[in-house]
Swiss-Prot record:
Reactions this protein catalyses: (2R,3S)-3-isopropylmalate = (2S)-2-isopropylmalate
Subunit architecture: Heterodimer of LeuC and LeuD.
Protein name stated in the entry: 3-isopropylmalate dehydratase large subunit
Recorded name of the encoding gene: leuC
Organism per entry: Mycobacterium ulcerans (strain Agy99)
InterPro entries from the UniProt entry: 3-IsopropMal_deHydase_lsu, Acnase/IPM_dHydase_lsu_aba_1/3, Acoase/IPM_deHydtase_lsu_aba, Aconitase_4Fe-4S_BS, Aconitase_4Fe-4S_dom, IPM_dehydratase_rel_enz, IPMI_cat
Length: 473
């Protein structure tokens, strides 16, 4: 696939240009070809109903893959799903996939898991692709240099029917993170610090490209974490240019090209970089050396501070809207200004989600938990992002580390990231979570969520208060 030639384009612009079927010439949306469509049980039922009513087939079932993730339990997966709504959604997905000829990985399948973990581990996610799913965190796949975005149910139907999507071109943003990350600081801390800096609307209307030496030094898992939470910064998508780290991750994956096809793909992938002199609509800079473990205190991902800080005082916030939002958040979170973040006790710790449910994340958690115990009164759930991640963790002995420490080692699924399955907080319970959203009630009605990295989650489970691994020494 040869790239179109034009002077000084960004990575996002290159991928976009290569997928324009019909140009709207700025008077209408461009019609964009979609390379991979991922489907799950929550946002697809009405889309399939629309196809059925119109008598349409799925245009490219071979470019469509489905998995069960949002509503599935993470224990007793061999038993019927207890919640009737969840059970209906899962059963409906199975019927729809069978009727329309779509590949499905159901509960119990070795490839089942969170859709944004399954795609990369199978090698379905590749540089230069356009990828969509009826899920906002589709941006995860941008870590591979793909243009990946969440879409609504009506758009899901459009892609199923045509393998295309009408889209207006996006603005572009460069986030430059240079320098060396201090020990104990991770990709999750980078993205939480960025969102605190630019706000949850800072990236609105943009595709963010993450650049700089700190980004280049990250593993693919770390890059996926950052691209995943681009949505919490208000962006439409996040991207990282592919490099040797990307290629080595993809090599020998089940759906990665091989032989001459690998060589051809690699030649294309190596062109997927922002050209020198390309102009971004917005640029943001972070100094990696100045970052430290980061946590949220409020009810949106932008309400965060370094772990070493205190709960902020709304009276010191100049903007009226932000001050009122902070006051409301502190009331919901039951926190007082000036309280040290490290003194905030938790009832639960959740490790998992499409943000931090991969094998690298579990290794970090195991390293902290090894030889230690979860604090009395704290419940810790560790949920792999896929069954293959779980199998790898078992092979490495991580599952035993988790259970010996007193954590609950679960099956794959979205779990406590959102209150759509049995894994939920009780009203008033406080949780340190490696997921991506801390909205009111996100983890269950009345639940209080602090977003953290896997390392901070593990240390918090041991101490019982928000903590970093360094606090355990």
């Amino acid at each position: 696939m040869a790239l179109q030639t034009r002077e000084a384009r960004t990575l996002a612009e290159k991928v976009w240009d290569d997928h324009v079927v019909v140009s709207g010439r700025n008077e209408a949306p461009d019609l964009i070809y979609i390379d991979l469509h991922q489907v799950h049980e929550v946002t697809s039922p009405q889309a399939f109903d629309g196809l059925r009513l119109a008598g349409r087939p799925v245009r490219r079932p071979d470019l469509t893959i489905a998995t069960e993730d949002h509503n599935v339990p993470t224990v007793d997966i061999d038993k019927p799903i207890a919640d009737p709504v969840s059970r209906t959604q899962v059963e409906t997905l199975r019927r729809n996939c069978a009727e329309f000829g779509i590949r499905l990985h159901p509960m119990g399948d070795v490839e089942q898991g969170i859709v944004h973990v399954v795609g990369p581990q199978l090698g379905l996610t590749q540089p230069g692709m356009t990828i969509v799913c009826g899920d906002s965190h589709t941006s995860t796949h941008g870590a591979f240099g793909a243009l990946a975005m969440g879409i609504g149910t009506s758009e899901v139907e459009h892609v199923l029917a045509t393998q295309t999507l009408p889209l207006w071109p996006f603005k572009t943003m460069a986030v430059n993170v240079d320098g060396q990350l201090p020990a104990g600081v991770s990709a999750k801390d980078i993205i939480l610090a960025l969102i605190a800096k630019i706000g949850t609307g800072g990236g609105q209307g943009h595709v963010i490209e993450y650049q700089g030496s700190a980004i280049e030094s990250l593993s693919m898992e770390g890059r996926m974490t950052i691209c995943n939470m681009s949505i919490e910064a208000g962006a439409r998508a996040g991207m990282v240019a592919p490099d040797e780290t990307t290629y080595e991750y993809l090599r020998n994956r089940p759906h990665a090209p091989t032989g001459a096809q690998w060589d051809a793909a690699l030649g294309y992938w190596q062109q997927l970089r922002t050209d020198p002199g390309a102009v971004f609509d917005t640029e943001v800079h972070l100094d990696a050396a100045e970052l430290s473990p980061f946590v949220t205190w409020g009810t949106n991902p932008g309400q965060g501070v370094p772990l070493c800080a205190t709960v902020p005082d709304p009276e010191l916030i100049g903007d009226d809207g932000e001050r009122q939002a902070a006051e409301k958040a502190l009331a919901y979170m039951d926190l007082e200004p000036g309280k040290a973040m490290r003194d905030i006790a938790v009832d639960a710790v959740f490790v998992g989600s499409c943000t931090n449910g991969r094998i690298e994340d579990l290794r970090v958690v195991a390293e902290v938990l090894r030889g230690r115990k979860v604090a009395p009164g704290v419940r810790m759930l560790i949920v792999p992002g896929s069954m293959r991640v779980r199998a790898q963790a078992e092979k490495e002995g991580l599952g035993e580390v988790f259970t010996v420490a007193g954590a609950e080692w679960r099956q794959a699924g979205c779990s406590m990231c959102l209150g759509m399955n049995p894994d939920q907080l009780a009203p008033g319970e406080r949780c340190a979570a490696t997921s991506n959203r801390n909205f009111e009630g996100r983890q269950g009605k009345g639940g209080r969520t602090h977003l953290v990295s896997p390392a901070v989650a593990a240390a918090t489970a041991v101490r019982g208060t928000l903590s970093a691994p360094a606090d355990l020494n």
